[in-house]
Regions:
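N-terminal glycine-rich flavin-associated loop
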Residues: 1-27, 50-102, 112, 116-149, ...
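Short, conserved charged micro-motifs
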Residues: 15, 75-77, 197-202, 246-254, ...
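Short Gly/Ser/Thr- and Asp/Glu-enriched loop/turn motifs at secondary-structure junctions
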Residues: 43, 233-235, 323-329
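Substrate-recognition/cap regions that form aromatic- and gly/pro-loop-enriched pockets
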Residues: 281-331
Length: 331
């Protein structure tokens, strides 16, 4: 059984890494452990549990900046920014349902280390693009800082970009600063019904190339569409999200519907059902470990959007799948 170290502050983290280095012990760095079921099991001697490093240390809504300890719950952070009518623009996925964990079990450090991003990535980027600053401990047991507490900083080489997506293999982050942005006033989703995968990806490509500022583009084949929140369709459904102030969303929806009429039947979802749908897509709810799919293996495949349908032909027909990121992400 792997031993666990649970530091109380950044100095404890530094001491733990220095000890592991001196004793030639391999460390597994975890925030709240919500993503440990991903990939193959790590071959480590000691777990460095950072959940004790918790709490928001700075939040300036007017400056669009938030700083928190690495082990701070994402639920706490999202509730705080929502109270100021703001959001995390990279729309971090909650892996909990997919991996058999409770909802909201992830930490800020885990979201950054995994470079999480939801459906809005095609418009706003991933966690890396909203990561402003960090304090961390290197593999040599040395504390270092990178970035700062401002949206635009010129503090030298941007190590933040390297740490995002490193899964804790390059450093143990202790304090993190991220960018927040205003929450959209409303949203609607345009739905195309009955398209096959090839035509759906063409339609999504046309929508993304338009001036409609689409913030989510997904295709849900008929065998799985009915399992997504907000939908009652038994047909293949191609979903295109529009966000912003109400008059703009209304105008862009009308423009997008006119653009896509030639692809077939077009309808739309209002704000409430749209939010439910995109939350379900973001968290891959139909594949939840405690859902109908059970504990089956789940693959996450990134590809060129235009090649998504071609790749899908190589997947066994017995497998369930859907597309996000305009065809560039296949679950």
């Amino acid at each position: 059984m792997t031993d666990t170290l649970k530091p109380r502050d950044a100095k404890d983290v530094e001491n733990a890494v220095q000890w592991a280095l001196a004793e030639s012990k391999a460390l597994e760095v975890v925030g709240r452990g919500s993503k440990r079921a991903l990939g193959r099991p790590g071959q480590t001697d000691v777990t460095l549990d950072l959940s004790g490093l918790s709490g928001v240390t700075l939040y300036e809504p007017e400056e669009l900046v938030l700083s928190a300890r690495a082990g701070t719950s994402m639920t706490e952070i999202e509730a705080l920014v929502a109270s100021k009518n703001q959001q995390l623009e990279f729309e971090p996925m909650d892996y909990g349902p997919l991996l058999g964990q409770p909802d909201g079990a992830g930490s800020l450090g885990g979201a950054i280390a995994a470079n999480l991003a939801g459906p809005r990535r095609i418009k706003s980027g991933a966690a890396r693009d909203h990561f402003l600053g960090v304090s961390a401990v290197s593999g040599r047991g040395e504390t270092f800082k990178s970035g700062g507490r401002v949206v635009k900083n010129v503090t030298g080489y941007d190590l933040c970009k390297v740490l995002a997506g490193s899964w804790g293999t390059l450093a143990a982050m202790t304090d993190i600063t991220i960018k927040t942005l205003p929450r959209a006033e409303t949203e609607e989703t345009v739905l195309l019904l009955g398209l096959d995968d090839v035509r759906a990806i063409r339609a999504m490509s046309a929508a993304m190339a338009s001036s409609c500022d689409v913030s989510g583009a997904a295709h849900l084949p008929a065998h799985i569409a009915f399992r997504f929140g907000g939908l009652e369709s038994t047909q293949a459904t191609t979903a295109l999200r529009l966000e912003g102030v109400a008059p703009s969303v209304k105008h862009r929806k009308e423009t997008l519907i006119a653009l896509l009429q030639s692809y077939g039947s077009v309808t739309s979802l209002g704000a409430e059902r749209s939010r439910l749908l995109w939350s379900s897509i973001r968290d891959v709810r139909p594949f939840a470990a405690n859902g109908p799919s059970g504990q089956r293996p789940v693959w996450r495949v990134s590809t060129v959007p235009s090649k998504g349908a071609e790749f899908a032909t190589m997947i066994p027909p017995s497998a369930q799948m859907f597309y996000d990121w305009a065809g560039g992400l296949i679950w």
